[in-house]
Design a protein with these regions (language model features):
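Hydrophobic alpha-helical transmembrane segments of membrane transport/permease proteins
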Residues: 1-33, 129-146
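Coil-to-alpha-helix initiation sites in intrinsically disordered, low-complexity, charged segments
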Residues: 17, 26-39, 56, 96, ...
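A short secondary-structure junction motif
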Residues: 43-47, 51, 128-132, 173
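Alpha-helical transmembrane segments of integral membrane proteins
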Residues: 65-98, 114, 139-281
Length: 281
């Protein structure tokens, strides 16, 4: 592609202007005749504009967010519960062969490529056993047979790293004084772990949960593209491949907003799980 062709494409799409401040203009045009003012300022009012094919991006987001949520929410909730439970079991049997076996299993699961889970799961469940469709999506209850395999793969692929991280958090807590005090009062080990240790480990758990908040809305880029699910993840991938900057810009902005909202919600949730934390400082 020649530089001339690049310049023509930029001019056609309005990207030949200055980014934030146009020195070539006079007065307020220095500020308004910029890419930021023309393309990005409207995003703060959640006006996403139109894609290159003329489709309304806001309507596409409203339509595509539900398939993304159908995958991301179960993966997040079930995956977190599975990781915490598995980590608690390893901590319960800590310094034993069961704990060592669990750690080895976590390392093995972490070492396997994500693409292997996708290809292997699709090949076994979809092609060999023919339990679920290989790809596609449907509305209503029919969507269950299309999302169950991506959800399962999303959960299994994250168990290794998630459980190992939670195990580290819980092991750090079990050596503290309040745990020894709880045991001295005659509480069972199960109650100590799932009531006292888990409660005091909630702050780092909540902090880690913030990172995945944008994916709850925007979906998984690889999962949706691989299984042909019309969610926001595949929407973003298609936009990148088509060089549709309007869609890419909108999705990046949306992800940033969700991340900031997640940080605020996390700070609020700290006050719920730990009475020592106060928002007023």
């Amino acid at each position: 592609v020649t530089q001339e062709a690049v310049n023509v494409r930029k001019e056609e799409r309005g990207y030949n202007k200055a980014l934030l401040w146009n020195h070539e203009q006079q007065g307020m045009d220095k500020l308004t005749d910029t890419i930021f003012f023309d393309k990005s300022l409207s995003l703060f009012a959640f006006e996403f504009g139109q894609a290159d094919d003329g489709r309304d991006i806001g309507e596409d987001i409203q339509t595509r967010m539900w398939p993304s949520l159908a995958i991301a929410v179960p993966v997040f909730i079930i995956g977190m519960l599975a990781n915490i439970t598995f980590a608690m079991l390893m901590v319960f049997f800590r310094a034993s062969y069961l704990d060592l076996s669990g750690v080895i299993l976590c390392v093995v699961l972490m070492s396997i490529s994500g693409l292997f889970y996708l290809i292997g799961g699709q090949f076994l469940a979809g092609k060999i056993m023919q339990l679920v469709p290989l790809s596609g999506y449907a509305q209503g209850l029919d969507a269950f047979k299309f999302v169950i395999l991506p959800v399962f793969i999303g959960i299994v692929s994250g168990i290794g790293s998630g459980s190992r991280w939670y195990r580290t958090l819980f092991l750090e807590e079990v050596s503290k004084d309040y745990v020894r005090t709880a045991r001295a009062k005659g509480l069972s080990e199960i109650r100590v772990l799932f009531v006292h240790v888990l409660k005091n480990a909630m702050i780092p758990i909540l902090t880690g949960a913030v990172v995945v908040l944008p994916t709850l809305f925007m979906g998984s880029l690889i999962l949706e593209s691989f299984f042909g699910i019309p969610g926001l993840g595949s929407y973003t991938i298609d936009a990148i491949q088509a060089q549709d900057f309007a869609i890419v810009r909108s999705m990046v902005f949306l992800g940033s907003v969700l991340y900031i909202v997640g940080l605020v919600l996390t700070d609020i949730s700290y006050t719920l799980v730990d009475p020592r934390v106060r928002l007023d400082g």
